[in-house]
Amino acid sequence: MMAGLLSTQCNSTLSKLKHLSNNPALSVLTSTHRKYSSKDGAGSEYLHKSIVPSMHYQKSLPRLPVPKLEDTIRRYLAAQRPLLNDEQYSNTEKLAQEFQSGAGKQLHEELVALDKKNKHTSYISAPWFDMYLSARESIVLNFNPFMSFNPDPKPEYNDQLVRATNMVCSAVRFMKTLRAGLLEPEVFHLNPAKSDTDSFKKLIRWVPPSISWFGAYMVNAYPLDMSQYFRLFNSTRIPKYKRDELLTDDRGRHLLVMKRGNLYVFDALDRDGNLIKPAEVQAHLKYILEDPTQASAFPLGVLTSENRDTWTGLRQKLLDAGNGEALQLVDTALFCLCLDEEVLRDHIHISHNMLHGDGCNRWYDKSFSVILAKDGQAAINFEHSWGDGVAVLRFQNEVFKDTTEKPLVGPGSQPASVDSSSAVRRLEFKLNDELKAGITKAKENFQAAVSKLTIDAMEFKKGGKEQLKKKKLSPDAIAQLAFQMGFLRQYGQTVATYESCSTAAFKHGRTETIRPASIHTKQCAKAFVQQPGQHSVEQLLGLLNECSKYHGQLTREAAMGQGFDRHLFAMRYLANSKGMALPSLYQDPAYAAINHNILSTSTLTSPAVSLGGFAPVVPDGFGVGYGVHDEWIGCNVSSYPARDVHEFLRCVHKSLEDIFTVLDGNPIH
């Protein structure tokens, strides 16, 4: 009866999801909009005990739609329009129309048929894994991003040993909570007063998992895909020729710790799978911090920063030299904790250290690493193939909340009187001359790559989310518009721009692309940058409004799986896998250009995260991490020598000043 009622009320996936579109923060779907209200007091083993089982909604999540081909072509051409002159656009339009009625029609039909056969997943999941795992470039800078933790509000708890101990304990508690099915499901609440309540949870837990999603939907709550979570722990990317593999072995009870490029392991769980005493974790970490062993002349971790095929060959040589057991301990460890000896001076120093560091005190292949500097500055650096940061951000939020609200050790805590010298093992590796030469070469390659990277940050203090919302403008749209204006001011052109948007509202959803550069942003940027004084305040406000409305539409479409990028990507992947001649749309220089993302952007706001960052995705690009806060807007931007990041940020700041001047009703000159 209930199933029938629910399914008749929720017959169309896309209409079910339309309410999601009202939220401006959809590009990250972060946990900041949800409070976890399940019962605490879960003892030292669990963070909390959710009333609703963690994976209760997973089975009934809606499937990621394959967009209609005509919609994809229309959206593709709309995104190409501001990037091309009339002649180029006319050619691209012709190729797109040929594709729609010819090769594209066939590929689309095959993709839809394939998708119907694989109802347990999404059409993008396998090709997306394949894309990441087949990439041969170094994962450092090219793929791994970082998100840094805010400091503990209690300064004395930022001591490196105290914070490391608390983070390890909270991380293990998170893992245990997740594996016991007691972690609160990831749900996006549009009406928390109705859906984020114990009474609703007690009701929904009895709705069968096959239809539970619909029950949540009826109270405007949207469960999100949690299929990536199982790769958080005991997981590593293993280098292989042509295509890497992901290894997850949840039998591992040990933690991997790195200091001065040396690798240590100790069991963080006892034989019964319980967290060892926090005082014992503290004792073992203290022992590692005080270990006088000097920095390794041949730090093995730097090999994980190499070209993937090069690393594959060297890994085989490591195995041949008798290092199999030590490598297995690295690969199956719960996660990696990197204890750095540097004190970090400022945001820029933090970004460089957490994004890449010196290459020696990292194992970049681990699913994630918690990095802790000498002064207690902390961050997560994560390998990107297994997930999109949705699981990592949830983990980071929970760990920050747990370590700051319920720390298990403090500045006055005494480490346990245990024999850490027998509990902690420093891994020894047998290295022949060939391996030593490989490590030396990897160090050189690493230094050459990171020495080209510049990072700069900017804080705009004259306004933020609150003021923009009062003016009925999308905060994300205005931030993206400022990047378009900034680039136009600096370089005089409009270029391919990428904004990541989560499709976690669907089963095995990954991301879709929002294309922030539009005919609207181009017109508005020209008015502000190249024609100041030629437009009235009312006209400029009208242009801002148009940009905001259109960006909101693009965001809604992307979050509902209605972009064009993933659909075109999947059809291209299908053509390649069949050995088909590549359709002419994909050979169009304009297709290459729109996928050469000079502005690669991603937004993040969370109470746990102070800043996030990543390198540009192309040599002549910018990597733009940003957050629109209540009263201010922050950007953390990277570039290579082809671009001037300092000047770019000055231009973005000037753009924001102009926008807020107009919002105050004043003209710009």
From Swiss-Prot:
UniProt intramembrane stretches: 191-220
Write down the EC number: 2.3.1.21
Asked if the record carries the keyword Transport, the reply is yes
A single GO BP = fatty acid beta-oxidation
Reading the lineage from the top rank, the first entry is: Eukaryota
Task: State the pathway, as annotated in the record.
Answer: Lipid metabolism; fatty acid beta-oxidation
| Example GO molecular function | carnitine O-octanoyltransferase activity
What does UniProt list as catalytic? Answer: H384 (proton acceptor)
Record has Acyltransferase as a keyword: yes
Q: Where is the transit peptide?
A: 1-36
Topology in the membrane? Peripheral membrane protein
Question: A cellular component term (GO) from this record?
Answer: mitochondrial inner membrane
Q: Where does (R)-carnitine bind?
A: Y498, S500, T511
Task: List ligand-binding residues for CoA.
Answer: G464, K465, E466, Q467, L468, K469, K470, K471, K472, L473, S474, P475, D476
State the InterPro entries in the record. Answer: Carn_acyl_trans, Carn_acyl_trans_N, CAT-like_dom_sf, Cho/carn_acyl_trans, Cho/carn_acyl_trans_2
Q: Which UniProt keywords apply?
A: Acyltransferase, Fatty acid metabolism, Lipid metabolism, Membrane, Mitochondrion, Mitochondrion inner membrane, Transferase, Transit peptide, Transport
Q: Where in the cell is it found?
A: Mitochondrion inner membrane
Give ranges for the Mitochondrial matrix compartment: 37-190, 221-669
Q: Which reaction does it catalyse?
A: (R)-carnitine + hexadecanoyl-CoA = O-hexadecanoyl-(R)-carnitine + CoA; octanoyl-CoA + (R)-carnitine = O-octanoyl-(R)-carnitine + CoA; decanoyl-CoA + (R)-carnitine = O-decanoyl-(R)-carnitine + CoA; dodecanoyl-CoA + (R)-carnitine = O-dodecanoyl-R-carnitine + CoA
The record's function comment reads: Involved in the intramitochondrial synthesis of acylcarnitines from accumulated acyl-CoA metabolites. Reconverts acylcarnitines back into the respective acyl-CoA esters that can then undergo beta-oxidation, an essential step for the mitochondrial uptake of long-chain fatty acids and their subsequent beta-oxidation in the mitochondrion. Active with medium (C8-C12) and long-chain (C14-C18) acyl-CoA esters.
Family label? Belongs to the carnitine/choline acetyltransferase family.
Task: Name the chain's protein.
Answer: Carnitine O-palmitoyltransferase 2, mitochondrial
What species was this sequence derived from? Danio rerio
Which gene carries the instructions for this protein? cpt2
